[in-house]
Amino acid sequence: MLRTIVVFAPIIAALAWVVFNIQKPAREQFNRDFLGKD
């Protein structure tokens, strides 16, 4: 359990950082590329 937390904590932190930085005009581009694929 502790090892899982140690492994996933940095991953979650990185994902949170990315999501936090996407809250900018880049998010519109992201949505266009991601949601407008089909």
From Swiss-Prot:
<keyword id="KW-0793">Thylakoid</keyword>
<dbReference type="Pfam" id="PF06298">
    <property type="entry name" value="PsbY"/>
</dbReference>
<keyword id="KW-0602">Photosynthesis</keyword>
<keyword id="KW-0812">Transmembrane</keyword>
<dbReference type="GO" id="GO:0009523">
    <property type="term" value="C:photosystem II"/>
</dbReference>
<keyword id="KW-1133">Transmembrane helix</keyword>
<dbReference type="GO" id="GO:0031676">
    <property type="term" value="C:plasma membrane-derived thylakoid membrane"/>
</dbReference>
<comment type="similarity">
    <text>Belongs to the PsbY family.</text>
</comment>
<keyword id="KW-0604">Photosystem II</keyword>
<protein>
    <recommendedName>
        <fullName>Photosystem II reaction center protein Y</fullName>
    </recommendedName>
</protein>
<dbReference type="InterPro" id="IPR009388">
    <property type="entry name" value="PSII_PsbY"/>
</dbReference>
<comment type="function">
    <text>Loosely associated component of the core of photosystem II (PSII), it is not always seen in crystals. PSII is a light-driven water plastoquinone oxidoreductase, using light energy to abstract electrons from H(2)O, generating a proton gradient subsequently used for ATP formation.</text>
</comment>
<keyword id="KW-0472">Membrane</keyword>
<feature type="transmembrane region" description="Helical">
    <location>
        <begin position="4"/>
        <end position="22"/>
    </location>
</feature>
<dbReference type="GO" id="GO:0015979">
    <property type="term" value="P:photosynthesis"/>
</dbReference>
<dbReference type="GO" id="GO:0030145">
    <property type="term" value="F:manganese ion binding"/>
</dbReference>
<comment type="subunit">
    <text>PSII is composed of 1 copy each of membrane proteins PsbA, PsbB, PsbC, PsbD, PsbE, PsbF, PsbH, PsbI, PsbJ, PsbK, PsbL, PsbM, PsbT, PsbX, PsbY, Psb30/Ycf12, peripheral proteins PsbO, CyanoQ (PsbQ), PsbU, PsbV and a large number of cofactors. It forms dimeric complexes.</text>
</comment>
